[in-house]
Design a protein with these regions (language model features):
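Membrane interfacial helix motifs at helix-loop boundaries and amphipathic/re-entrant anchors
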Residues: 76-94
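Conserved beta-hairpin
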Residues: 91-138
Length: 208
């Protein structure tokens, strides 16, 4: 999709300094995340790209809380299904009980995302956000993922909720999406158009 007429777009930030920062982007998910505060877990930029300006990954405490919640849920379900606590004597049931929370724990620990002035990366890959050719939102429930593909074949995806948990990260990505839409022929699916590009939710106030 490209624009039929001239449109005044926000300026592109400098690849090294990130200035000027893009204007605040509209959000679909207005709930705050639980970001990691340990700078030692800050992702690195893709090879040959400018510095990381913003990043997000769930905090360790959030991951541990999620593990405990899922473990407790599986414990309750196991007791209900077996009609009591007799299953606790069977090691096979313990393996089944632990499988789901362990897998969720490992998945959550490995997920991250970062943005520079003109790129976005996650644990699934990276793209040049001003050279996008495809913007799609897919997935059901409360955690749909935004899939991005650029002109060089780069591709990545991440949960929209997490991308928008860091407003400044989302500002960078959204600015690249809007520029791509007005300068390139970009394939956009209906879900992305409604929930990302034409979203009508109020903008969230910055919290510095």
């Amino acid at each position: 999709m490209s624009s039929d007429g001239p449109v005044e777009l926000p300026p592109r930030p400098d690849p090294q300094t990130g200035e000027p920062r893009p204007p605040e982007a509209p959000v679909t998910w207005d709930g705050g995340g639980d970001p990691e505060a340990d700078s030692r877990r800050r992702p690195k930029p893709p090879p040959g790209q400018g510095p990381v300006l913003e990043w997000y990954r769930d905090s360790r405490s959030y991951t541990y809380r999620l593990f405990a919640f899922v473990l407790g849920l599986m414990f309750v379900l196991g007791s209900v299904i077996s009609g009591g606590f007799s299953w606790m004597k069977d090691w096979v049931f313990w393996l089944i009980l632990l499988f789901a929370p362990v897998m969720i724990f490992l998945t959550q620990r490995s997920q991250w995302m970062a943005a520079g002035a003109d790129w976005f990366a996650s644990d699934t890959g990276w793209v040049k956000i001003y050279e996008l050719t495809k913007v799609e939102l897919a997935g059901s429930g409360v955690s749909p993922s935004l899939y991005l593909t650029d002109a060089e074949g780069g591709a990545t995806h991440a949960e929209l909720r997490r991308m928008q948990a860091n407003q400044r990260l989302w500002d960078l990505v959204y600015n690249g999406i809007i520029h791509s839409l007005h300068t390139r022929d970009v394939k956009v699916n209906t879900a992305a158009r409604i929930q990302v590009i034409e979203v009508g939710y109020p903008r969230r106030r910055r919290q510095d």
